[in-house]
Amino acid sequence: MTDPSDAGYPETNYPRSTRQLTPLELARRIAHLAESKLASDVVILDMRPAVSYTDFFVICTAANPRQARAITDEVREKLKHEDRVLPRHVSGEREATWIVSDYLDVVLHVFTPEARAYYRLEELWGDVPSIELEAVAG
């Protein structure tokens, strides 16, 4: 789990969370936060059988680069303030056709439709299981 103090942020700026999220809970939380900013085709891939550097990929589509940035920002801000979780690294925000946010246990991939069709991560990792998204309560 990413600790805010590891990223150079003073720990005192964050409210105390009652418990840490498991990697699967974090993946589902990220997926639902992306959906809240109208991301489409949200998929969670269980990467544990295939790679050692992360547990899950969350892959989603934004209508355009502006929405890709908005999704990335929403996830980052909500996790930062509500769960005390920060990404270790974010790349691709300038062009915003494929933004990758590395939360260590979970990697968020936000694509524009063209970039998602071009890179086809689901096909590349077609042998790993996908995780069902639970309905958002409320």
Feature locations, PLM:
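Mid-chain, well-packed structural core segment of small domains
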Residues: 78-107
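Short amphipathic alpha-helices in soluble, non-transmembrane regions
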Residues: 71-76
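P-loop NTPase catalytic core of nucleic-acid-dependent motor ATPases
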Residues: 52
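Long, contiguous binding/interaction regions
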Residues: 1-44, 48-49, 63-70, 91-93, ...
